[in-house]
Amino acid sequence: MKNVYPGVDDKMIDRTVNLLLNKRDGNGGFKKNPRALDSFGAADEDVTNAYIVYALSEAGYKDIAKELAAVEKEARKSGDPYTMALCANALYNLGENVRGDDMVARLINARGEVGFWSGKKHSITRSTGQSLKTETTSLILLALLKAQNPDVQAISSAVKFLVGARSGYGGFGSTQATILALKALTKYAEFSKRTDEAGTIELLVN
């Protein structure tokens, strides 16, 4: 939220983070509220844990090594592209680049020739179908862009799919899918402006 709107209260963010950290169960997971009334509270345990770790890492909090390891283990076991993508982004955010690259390599191998990825179950908001494809592909594109040696072909496939998933009204399906797609495409636009190596430009005037 802070990256989108600088006016967000830091104390509110800290309270939210502390609430999540206090929900740690000591085994690498987070305790869920059984009284949750919305789709965020209805996601499966592995999806919820992966999303919380991803969110905390995006916010810059690093004291979650145990939770990250648990999410990574479960993602490898399940082979679910959605949780693997959340895990890969968290790994990169926390400086675990080698482990992040390994997770990305697994995702690339799982893509096949279809040009997009989809989760095996549902997303944190219990999205399925086209929205799940868009959310998963967006998260994977974000991870691909963070890789130490970005796979240009995989990146291009993901971008092509996301651009094609946009509706005539400018959305990409569900609210969550639209947010992630816009974030991923914005990061791609920044990435595409980079040069491969440092250099100088000479301007010759005749």
Language-model-detected regions and their locations in the chain:
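Large, well-folded core regions of big proteins
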Residues: 1-206
